[in-house]
Amino acid sequence: PSILHTRGLVFAQRDMDVVLQAARSNQPFGVLTGLMPSGRMHLGHTMVIEQAKWYQSHGADVSVAVADLESLATRGVSLDKGRKIALEQYVSNYAAMGLDPDKTQVYFQSTRPEVQRLGFRLGRRTNLSELGAIYGFEGDTNLAHVQAPLVQVGDIVHPMLDEYGGIRPIVVPVGVDQDPHIRLTRDIVSKTPVSYTHLTLPTKSS
């Protein structure tokens, strides 16, 4: 285990046994993490990348989502400014921290239509009441902000599309404050018998 595990900074998980089994048997598995391009990199980002590096050292491929659409929707950061912040404040530092460029994909939500389409289709499995209860949306919340969590669901699921590596376990290291979103994503996927290109999202019975 990494120092983050041994010191108790990583203290919760779901289905980690599936990931560890993949690593031990040299089977494919991946990591999906992201960044909001609206400010400077901080210690929390560093700990997430240290986790990603640890998984990568055990065979994982890493996908890094630049949440430029979410930054635009929730914080009013233009796509051009978000791109500049991401490249100067985050991506360059991630490379300096030692992520293997041959096993790392960095992408922008705004330029990966598969993510947007997945978010749209998976959005049929939730509703405004549920999103409002989780995220506190109210009548004056702009609709781009409401859509942002569904784009994040697309971020998490899309590495399992054939063109991005196919079906395999995906680890999503997040802070405990993000757990409601992870639970939402798992719930949506578990009840979505939807074929998307060659990816069939599992139902609860599968």
Feature annotation, model-predicted:
Residues 2-71, 172-176:
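N-terminal catalytic cores of NTP/NDP-binding nucleotidyl/phosphoryl-transfer enzymes
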Residues 38-40, 71-74, 114-116, 180:
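Flexible loop/turn segments at secondary-structure boundaries
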Residues 43-44, 74-77, 185:
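A short acidic (Asp/Glu
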Residues 44-47, 78-85:
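Alpha-helix N-cap and loop-to-helix initiation/capping positions
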Residues 55-58, 97, 200:
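Alpha-helix C-cap/termination motif
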Residues 81-196:
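Divalent-metal (Mg2+/Mn2+/Ca2+)-assisted nucleotide/phosphate chemistry catalytic cores
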Residues 197-203:
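Conserved small/polar residues in nucleotide/adenosyl-binding loops
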Residues 206:
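Helix-loop elements that line ligand-binding/catalytic pockets
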